[in-house]
């Protein structure tokens, strides 16, 4: 016999860079749809517990990442970066500092372990 479950309410979270739609967040996994407005960026941050993969549905986004806290040193970019387009994905392991900057309006999916607000350690504020 097939198990069924009730649908969950999708949580809408406005952000300075766009918004998140939380499709699911439970003890097993988390799935979100993220929308970034062109020219906007999230904070430079990391997670001690969360492991996440981003999949770009549409648009173009630059991901900055590094194991160190500094993204810039004396105005010079010291973090690594990659530009992702539709169909690309990027894995953010626990502890990896990261930030996303939308080159175009961008829609992406986040697949991760469970999300806890207390597990976001912001180093530099975003939009």
Named regions from a protein language model:
Residues 3-4, 8-9, 13-14, 69-73, ...:
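Double-stranded beta-helix
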Residues 9-50, 57:
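A short glycine-rich, His/Asp/Glu-containing loop-to-beta-strand
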Residues 40, 49-50, 60, 96, ...:
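A generic "binding-loop/recognition-motif" signal
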Residues 43-45, 63-64, 90-92, 97-103, ...:
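Short beta-strand His + acidic residue motifs that chelate non-heme Fe in jelly-roll/DSBH
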Residues 49-71:
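Glycine- and acidic-residue-biased ligand/ion/polar-headgroup-sensing regions
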Residues 60, 81-83:
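Ser/Thr- (and often Asn-) enriched beta-sheet segments in non-cytosolic proteins
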């Amino acid at each position: 016999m097939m198990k069924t479950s009730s649908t969950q309410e999708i949580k809408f979270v406005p952000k300075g860079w766009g918004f998140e739609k939380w499709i699911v967040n439970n003890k097993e996994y988390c799935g979100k749809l993220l929308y970034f407005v062109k020219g906007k960026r999230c904070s430079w941050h990391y997670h001690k517990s969360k492991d996440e993969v981003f999949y770009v549905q549409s648009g173009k986004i630059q991901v900055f990442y590094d194991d160190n806290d500094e993204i810039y040193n004396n105005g010079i970019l010291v973090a690594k970066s990659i530009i992702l387009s539709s169909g690309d994905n990027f894995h953010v392991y626990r502890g990896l500092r990261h930030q996303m900057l939308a080159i175009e309006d961008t829609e992406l999916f986040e697949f991760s372990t469970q999300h806890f607000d207390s597990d976001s350690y912001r180093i530099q504020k975003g939009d």
